[in-house]
């Protein structure tokens, strides 16, 4: 089961993530985990168990190493902490900006009894149901995002629900999709172009690039890792959604000293119907970015 690192997942859903966490403990290591060892993981878990919740700043006895990518830490313990989270041994109990506080999973949640891992069938149904809630209309790739091997099993479950009339086939640009009857019966009117949202590149609407392009005709590129001369939209461009169209990508930077949000680059991708609405959304975003943290 997958969610983005910057997303929230309901604690009640933890049981659906447990099977994958346990598979990671005993199966082949993920490629980005290989810089750590099982001994490293045991060491940081023991430290949290003995000393209580901690951040990477609390670990001062690491021998520093060179970074192997832009946002990596020079402290080896950082990777071990992240592996322990992926395995379900630790969780992030608090976050201040990019600084995470790590705590024992069981101690943080305080369960009277630890949740029972979902069965394979329950895990599959949860994956489909979650996609239907979030996306409304789903395809096999959108349900099986980052898990393509599950497509045959998910298709079987979908076809079973179609036979029971719990799902209805829908054609979107020649690609098979499905939706619940209630979703199709409650399709709202076209969104007002005066309703404008600045979206994160990690927003669920944006992060599945193939789905985004099919529904909106817009192909987003996250370019933080792309050399500046080769960027099209900018370092951290935010898609601008006006009504039901993406009209631009805005690469913004907050200048706190000047009390402004600067537009580093504005890339139009469609005609803007309501310019004042876009300006108002930018002003709202600026107020949010500059708001004092209490």
Name each model feature, range by range.
Residues 1-294:
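Long, charged, low-complexity, helical-prone intrinsically disordered regions
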């Amino acid at each position: 089961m997958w969610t983005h690192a910057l997303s929230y997942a309901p604690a009640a859903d933890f049981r659906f993530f447990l099977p994958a966490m346990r598979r990671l403990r005993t199966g082949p290591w993920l490629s980005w985990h290989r810089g750590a060892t099982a001994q490293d993981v045991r060491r940081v878990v023991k430290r949290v168990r003995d000393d209580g919740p901690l951040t990477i700043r609390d670990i001062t006895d690491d021998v520093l190493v060179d970074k192997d990518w832009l946002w990596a830490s020079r402290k080896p313990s950082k990777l071990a902490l992240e592996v322990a989270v992926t395995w379900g041994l630790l969780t992030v109990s608090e976050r201040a900006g990019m600084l995470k506080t790590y705590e024992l999973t069981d101690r943080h949640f305080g369960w009277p009894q630890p949740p029972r891992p979902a069965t394979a069938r329950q895990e599959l149904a949860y994956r489909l149901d979650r996609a239907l809630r979030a996306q409304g209309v789903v395809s096999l790739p959108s349900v099986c995002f980052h898990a393509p091997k599950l497509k045959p099993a998910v298709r079987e479950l979908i076809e079973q629900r179609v036979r029971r009339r719990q799902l209805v086939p829908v054609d979107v640009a020649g690609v098979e999709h499905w939706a619940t009857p209630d979703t199709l019966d409650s399709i709202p009117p076209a969104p007002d172009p005066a309703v404008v949202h600045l979206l994160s590149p990690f927003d669920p609407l944006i992060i599945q690039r193939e789905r985004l392009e099919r529904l909106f005709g817009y192909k987003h590129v996250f370019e933080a890792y792309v050399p500046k001369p080769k960027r099209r939209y900018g370092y951290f461009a935010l898609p601008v959604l006006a009504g039901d169209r993406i009209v631009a990508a805005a690469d913004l930077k907050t200048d706190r000293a000047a009390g402004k949000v600067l537009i580093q680059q504005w890339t139009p991708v469609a005609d803007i119907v309501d310019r004042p609405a876009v300006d108002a959304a930018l002003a709202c975003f600026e107020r949010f970015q500059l708001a004092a943290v209490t």
